[in-house]
Amino acid sequence: MAKKSLNETSPVARFEQSLEELEQLVQKMEVGDLSLEQSLTAYERGIGLYRDCQQALEQAELRVRLLTDPARPELAEAFEPPSLDG
């Protein structure tokens, strides 16, 4: 069977893959061997991965809320993460 692409996998699998890639990017950046351009590219990719992880966590929380009380799905409100603005 062909391996599923990142877009076809479950949100949990995408979260795990994104988190792993994000951790690898952080390690590369912490070493300090990247050029400024490479660092900026890695940072941009990292922000995208971070947002993907946040979205997957929000979806997981909604699923948990529905599973916890399926008789009252109206309680499954969207999770509002804290603002990243300082």
UniProtKB/Swiss-Prot annotation:
It is an enzyme of class 3 (hydrolase). It catalyses: Exonucleolytic cleavage in either 5'- to 3'- or 3'- to 5'-direction to yield nucleoside 5'-phosphates. It comes from the Bacteria. One of its GO terms (biological process) is DNA catabolic process. GO terms for cellular component: cytosol; exodeoxyribonuclease VII complex. SUPFAM superfamilies: XseB-like (SSF116842). InterPro entries: Exonuc_VII_S, Exonuc_VII_ssu_sf. Disulfide bonds: none annotated. It holds the Pfam family Exonuc_VII_S. One of its GO terms (molecular function) is exodeoxyribonuclease VII activity. It is found in: Cytoplasm. Keywords: Cytoplasm, Exonuclease, Hydrolase, Nuclease. Its EC number is 3.1.11.6. Bidirectionally degrades single-stranded DNA into large acid-insoluble oligonucleotides, which are then degraded further into small acid-soluble oligonucleotides. Belongs to the XseB family. PANTHER family: EXODEOXYRIBONUCLEASE 7 SMALL SUBUNIT (PTHR34137:SF1). NCBIfam families: PRK00977.1-4 (NF002140), xseB (TIGR01280). Heterooligomer composed of large and small subunits. This is Exodeoxyribonuclease 7 small subunit. It comes from Xanthomonas axonopodis pv. citri (strain 306). The gene is xseB.
